[in-house]
């Protein structure tokens, strides 16, 4: 149950092992990954294929808010919290892309970086972030399935 793609118990949770932390994967994501951009967020993503059944989860994500864009730590932390919650509510879209139940998709892993690129004056509401993450994840699904 530790690294299952979608166990019924944790469908809408963001587990610790789903957070992208490996420096090598993060560096590769920014160097060779694709990106899509919205009004407030920019997503970098990269699909990797492993021939051996890996213990890492199908989708790993990281969230970042630049100190340059949002100088106050309290605001940065709030934005990251909102981004994590919006992703958590919409992440089920991505698991259809990396569904381990389909043999042609087994061994597929997706790394995603969600960056806040909005302004520092006014911050988007949770609902706006949720809609934008949903739209950007839909774009990822379309580009990766073709």
Swiss-Prot record:
It comes from the Bacteria. It catalyses: Endonucleolytic cleavage of RNA, removing 5'-extranucleotides from tRNA precursor. InterPro entries: Ribosomal_Su5_D2-typ_SF, Ribsml_uS5_D2-typ_fold_subgr, RNase_P, RNase_P_CS. It holds the Pfam family Ribonuclease_P. Keywords: Endonuclease, Hydrolase, Nuclease, RNA-binding, tRNA processing. GO terms for molecular function: ribonuclease P activity; tRNA binding. Its EC number is 3.1.26.5. GO terms for biological process: tRNA 5'-leader removal. RNaseP catalyzes the removal of the 5'-leader sequence from pre-tRNA to produce the mature 5'-terminus. It can also cleave other RNA substrates such as 4.5S RNA. The protein component plays an auxiliary but essential role in vivo by binding to the 5'-leader sequence and broadening the substrate specificity of the ribozyme. Consists of a catalytic RNA component (M1 or rnpB) and a protein subunit. Belongs to the RnpA family. This is Ribonuclease P protein component.
């Amino acid at each position: 149950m530790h690294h299952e793609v979608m166990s019924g118990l944790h469908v809408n949770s963001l587990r610790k092992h789903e957070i992208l932390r490996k420096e090598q994967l993060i560096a590769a994501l920014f160097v060779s990954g694709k990106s899509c951009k919205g009004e407030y967020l920019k997503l970098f993503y990269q699909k990797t294929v492993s021939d051996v059944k890996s213990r890492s989860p199908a989708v790993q994500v990281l969230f970042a808010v630049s100190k340059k864009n949002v100088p106050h730590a309290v605001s940065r932390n709030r934005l990251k919290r909102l981004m994590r919650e919006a992703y958590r509510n919409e992440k089920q879209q991505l698991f259809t892309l990396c569904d381990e139940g389909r043999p042609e998709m087994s061994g597929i892993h997706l790394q995603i970086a969600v960056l806040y690129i909005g302004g520092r004056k006014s911050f988007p509401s949770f609902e706006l972030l949720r809609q934008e993450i949903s739209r950007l994840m839909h774009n990822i699904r379309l580009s990766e399935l073709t």
